[in-house]
Amino acid sequence: MKILRIDSSPLGDASVSRQLTASIVAALRQATPDAEVSVRDLTVAPPDHLTGELMQVVKFRNLEGLTARQQEELALTDALVDEFLAADVVVIGAPMYNFTVPTQLKAWIDRIAQAGRTFRYTETGPVGLAGGKKVYIASTRGGVYSTNAAMSALDHQEAFLRTVLGFLGVTDVTVIRAEGVGMGPDARAKALAAAQQEIDALAVPVAA
């Protein structure tokens, strides 16, 4: 089994989402000791946001007369897509920033959403090509957004990720959430304990 861990928080060791992604991967490895793990830290070498120039290369594949930088960006994009497609399990660290995902994570999504590779257009609509994998989303939030409709309407984080992954054909998605972590030490500890309890269940091997 190949596990791909994606981290997007710039907070380093202070990041709650990184704490959760590390715990999720550890639990999965406990259940499947021979699993191969790759880590993509989107804050160490963040992919550039798409410009008009980059769109022509990495999205529309106009490949004549590429500059050295364009060749590098094309190679990076293809590597990110290959890495995503090769993974059996993807663990995504996704803190909520201003009601949505960090800019680094959005830039990664823009690279892996590739027509002809992770989805394709048909006469009846788009079809995802990246199915057959499991995704865990380590969702962290300073406030609480899951308990009432008014706050849930502000969620452009988990809902966005489920939409994008579904578009790519990935429907086996589990969200492990720690919310309210900015509402004081007690709320933070309670949220982390609840998330860890969910994670601990992943460490139990599945009977053949």
From Swiss-Prot:
<dbReference type="GO" id="GO:0009055">
    <property type="term" value="F:electron transfer activity"/>
</dbReference>
<feature type="binding site">
    <location>
        <begin position="15"/>
        <end position="17"/>
    </location>
    <ligand>
        <name>FMN</name>
    </ligand>
</feature>
<feature type="binding site">
    <location>
        <begin position="140"/>
        <end position="143"/>
    </location>
    <ligand>
        <name>FMN</name>
    </ligand>
</feature>
<dbReference type="InterPro" id="IPR023048">
    <property type="entry name" value="NADH:quinone_OxRdtase_FMN_depd"/>
</dbReference>
<keyword id="KW-0560">Oxidoreductase</keyword>
<feature type="binding site">
    <location>
        <begin position="96"/>
        <end position="99"/>
    </location>
    <ligand>
        <name>FMN</name>
    </ligand>
</feature>
<dbReference type="Pfam" id="PF02525">
    <property type="entry name" value="Flavodoxin_2"/>
</dbReference>
<comment type="similarity">
    <text>Belongs to the azoreductase type 1 family.</text>
</comment>
<dbReference type="InterPro" id="IPR029039">
    <property type="entry name" value="Flavoprotein-like_sf"/>
</dbReference>
<comment type="function">
    <text>Also exhibits azoreductase activity. Catalyzes the reductive cleavage of the azo bond in aromatic azo compounds to the corresponding amines.</text>
</comment>
<comment type="function">
    <text>Quinone reductase that provides resistance to thiol-specific stress caused by electrophilic quinones.</text>
</comment>
<keyword id="KW-0288">FMN</keyword>
<dbReference type="GO" id="GO:0010181">
    <property type="term" value="F:FMN binding"/>
</dbReference>
<dbReference type="InterPro" id="IPR050104">
    <property type="entry name" value="FMN-dep_NADH:Q_OxRdtase_AzoR1"/>
</dbReference>
<protein>
    <recommendedName>
        <fullName>FMN-dependent NADH:quinone oxidoreductase</fullName>
        <ecNumber>1.6.5.-</ecNumber>
        <ecNumber>1.7.1.17</ecNumber>
    </recommendedName>
</protein>
<keyword id="KW-0520">NAD</keyword>
<dbReference type="InterPro" id="IPR003680">
    <property type="entry name" value="Flavodoxin_fold"/>
</dbReference>
<comment type="subunit">
    <text>Homodimer.</text>
</comment>
<dbReference type="GO" id="GO:0016652">
    <property type="term" value="F:oxidoreductase activity, acting on NAD(P)H as acceptor"/>
</dbReference>
<keyword id="KW-0285">Flavoprotein</keyword>
<feature type="binding site">
    <location>
        <position position="9"/>
    </location>
    <ligand>
        <name>FMN</name>
    </ligand>
</feature>
<dbReference type="GO" id="GO:0016655">
    <property type="term" value="F:oxidoreductase activity, acting on NAD(P)H, quinone or similar compound as acceptor"/>
</dbReference>
